Amino acid sequence: MHMNIIVVKNYEEASQKAFEIIKSLVIEKPDANLGLATGSTPIRLYELMCEDHRVNKTSYKDVNTFNLDEYYGLKHDHPQSYYHFMHEHLFKHIDIKKENVHIPIGEGHIEEDCKRYNQLLSNNKRDIQLLGLGSNGHIGFNEPGTSFDTSTHYIALKESTIKDNAALFFNGDLDAVPKSAITMGIHNIMESKHILLIACGKRKAEAVKGMIEGEVTEELPASILQRHPHVTVIIDEEAASLLTK
Ligand SMILES: N[C@@H]1[C@@H](O)[C@H](O)[C@@H](COP(=O)(O)O)O[C@@H]1O
């Protein structure tokens, strides 16, 4: 097993650690391909990147980014679209070029767009893929039961995911959360040279245990990371609390 597991005290330390990894990659390789994620977890990391860009002038002008997923049916300017999230939390604060930003399109011709995104991904291998972790073990929006062979696809969200995201982003309003999404598949995620997963808090402890100590199963999508040659997992004490080894 090639997982490098880093246990830190809390969310702030986890974000700092992840930031160090991303920053040193961008400095070493100014035209790096970054696979990016949304959700509540990377928010502090993105803040640190913006601050560092402002203060230390770390440049993203030759960086390309590829986001994991997008809700289906939200317009770009919807405040909860991932497109909007990424612009607000990261892109508008750094010197990345608009044309270097890639996010799946969550409306219109699904099949064509998935095909186009897959082509883009296979032409641009990611140097690093940032991941959060769903409380049910999903990565991107690859819900439990998704085949490990998938590339970018349309997926119906599980009840638990709708609930989690309602609580975090939609003021608890289940009806406001889109019921489906477009996501990079497990196959696309596994193509990245390095995978960096951050998980914090008690509600992730079960999934973290399965991901690291459980069997590799499509019922817990993140468990596939055990088969990747270069994975860094950053977890806080709460998320690590059920680990036995
Ligand atoms: N599609 C996203 C994932 O990319 C994210 O990693 C996960 C965890 O979210 P959070 O970081 O808010 O716990 O759930 C969301 O549904």
Model regions and ranges:
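N-terminal glycine-/serine-/threonine-rich phosphate-binding loop
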Residues: 1-34
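Glycine-rich N-terminal segment of FAD-binding domains in flavoprotein oxidoreductases
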Residues: 28-54
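ATP/nucleoside-binding phosphotransfer catalytic cores, i.e., glycine-rich phosphate-binding loops
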Residues: 184-187, 191-245
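Short beta-strand segments
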Residues: 35-39, 67, 104, 130-133, ...
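Class I SAM-dependent methyltransferase SAM-binding "motif I" and its flanking Rossmann-like core
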Residues: 140-186
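Ligand-binding beta-strand-loop-alpha-helix segment within the catalytic cores
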Residues: 1-2, 58-129
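A glycine-rich beta-strand to alpha-helix segment
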Residues: 32, 40-41, 45, 120-147
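A glycine- and small-aliphatic-rich helix-loop capping segment at beta-alpha/alpha-beta transitions
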Residues: 48-59, 82, 144-153, 214-216
